[in-house]
Amino acid sequence: MKKSVKRKFGHERGIKYRKKTGDITRKKRLYFMMFAVFITMFGLCGRIFWIQFIKGEWLKKMAYEQHSMDRFFNPCRGTIYDSTGEKILAVSGSVESITVNPVNIKKDDREKLAHKLSDLFQLDYDNVLKKISKRSSIETIVNKIDKDKSNELRNWLVENNITTGVNIDVDTKRFYPYNTMASQIIGFCGVDNQGLMGIESKYDDELRGKKGSITKLTDAKGGSLENEGEEYLEAQNGDDLILTIDATIQGIAEKYLKEACIDNKCTDGGNIIIMNPQNGDILAMAGYPDYNLNNPYIPITEEANEWDSLSKEEKTKIQQNMWRNKAISDSYEPGSTFKLITASAALEEGITDTDNTSEFNCGGGITIGGVRIKCWRYYRPHGSESLREALMNSCNPVFISLGQKLGVKTYYSYLEKFGLLSKTGIDLQGEGGSIFLNENKVGPVELATISFGQRFEITPIQMVTAVSTIANGGNYIKPRVVKKIVNNNTGEVKEIQSEIKGRAISEETSKKILSMMESVVSEGTGKNAKVQGYSIGGKTGTSEDGVNTGKYVTSFIGVAPTDNPQIVILITLYNPTGEGGHQGGGVAAPIASQVLGEVLPYLQVKKNNDEGNEIKKVKVPNVIGLKFSDAKKMLSDSNLNIDVPENTDENAIITEQIPISGVEVFEESNIIVK
């Protein structure tokens, strides 16, 4: 009995256990299924949310693009004006472009259409036929065609009953009314209307505008749907630019620069920068050789005659050279023009003054750190000099001694104040920088050469900006080329303000330097820069282009008028090889006289009161082959001075003269003979 009860109890307990276990299993399955359903629903909801709210716009766009076709057309690129706002330097004209929708062109029309397009636009027939026969929605045939040709195509399409598949859309093409004028400043555009060089590139975002479009609904194959209209989105034209460049002054600078480069056989060209020192405006920036903006890939120099025979590499080299704006991108040794910076620093620091008689003595050279550095006129030393006389004579030893007194740290602080250790920040593409030794590597000899403008390099724009700092009373002003941006859609005008970066020297020092610069032109090495009726200040410069290259850079920096500076002009000629030599006073200074002689009256700058004392020019006689005594008399009869080596024998025969005979110079100019 006990056993039976036990078995019964055990049996019931087992049944209850199995029942309990089964219940748990069913619950687990139920929970698992509920969890799985929850996860699935959560995932589906998440996916729906992702599709609807996160990727919804993108998917809608993709779906729309699958059954629509866009044809884009360019906006009218902004116009570029000169400083007057009247002369147009760059403008976009209306042309047209041809595209096709291959899926909408009937097979029977393809060959004759390809023949017409290839003949009319001088294209390769096979290439055109290949485009027309593609299974694509749109192909470009040709861009920027004249309207007479597009009208001819329109008439042909009507005559041949081709009503779909060929699109003639409005486009724009860039035109440059003055062809070569300011080519290296303005730059040019590519076939897609994107600026590639100069201002066109620097201000591309402002000039380009926003493209417009024509949208059509299409079927699955890309064909146009009948009875469906087009959606037209108007293009937004680009902004206009008003430059600081004055087209008249630019033309004057380019005219005389070209003449000078050709007459003096400047193998590496030249440039002229004219700047308003009071506000940093670049009034002109001429470079030679230049190029035609309407055909920028072909040179206009003698190289054009052999263009087709040149290799791709040779063509690229020539193009890069003519496109490059050397006035801002290339560095050079400024030579004696840099003595203005040394003199400014020395005067500002109070270690010298302009007219201390016999303060300096030129013995033909000076020894620094065991190295003998000669004066350019070592053969007949200048002797006792004041600072004014030293600048007039361009005497190297005087400026070397000033540099030594200033010391490296102080000298470099003035280089920084004059903006010579960094780029100017001019709003043009491709500005280069200066090349100076690190301050901690400059010893006495290095400082000596820097003091008279050698063994370092700066860009022409840095030099003209530094001298503009002297001319305006001591403020360093950032140069600029664009002064206004005009929004074509709203009419809003944005003024680009002049930016004063800091003070380099005092007004007192500025006046002293300007006074000495005037003496350089009236009595010193810059006599050939004189302009009747105006007070002109300046400094000549000659330096070697590289070390032992045999090439020279000739320059002149000028200020006019010195009593109220409105112009700073820098003329730089690279490797003049003509008979006139390579001295700044004989080659570059006369160009300044020509340019300023036209620019100052154009700007209505008043003449001074000594207009009655007419400055006459005379032709230099030929004294080669004469005795020194005879040459001296001949030059004196022409109101010219002779510059001869010290202790020259009166009976010695002259074998060289600078400038050569026939060159016109002002009376009282020095003629160097050897």
Feature roles, as predicted:
Residues 82-83, 368, 531, 623:
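Structural motif
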Residues 165-167, 240, 269-271, 357-359, ...:
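Residues at or immediately flanking beta-strands
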Residues 533, 571-674:
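Ligand-recognition elements built from short beta-strands and adjacent flexible loops
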Residues 1-305, 331, 409-419, 529-530, ...:
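Periplasmic/cell-envelope proteins involved in peptidoglycan metabolism and beta-lactam response
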Residues 7-8, 89-90, 219-230, 278-337, ...:
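Beta-lactam-recognizing serine transpeptidase/beta-lactamase-like catalytic domain environment
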Residues 208, 352-353, 625:
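Glycine-centered C-terminal helix-capping/turn motifs at helix ends
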Residues 73-78, 92-95, 136, 163, ...:
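Extracytoplasmic
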Residues 68-69, 172-173, 526-527, 541, ...:
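Short aromatic-glycine motifs in intrinsically disordered, low-complexity regions
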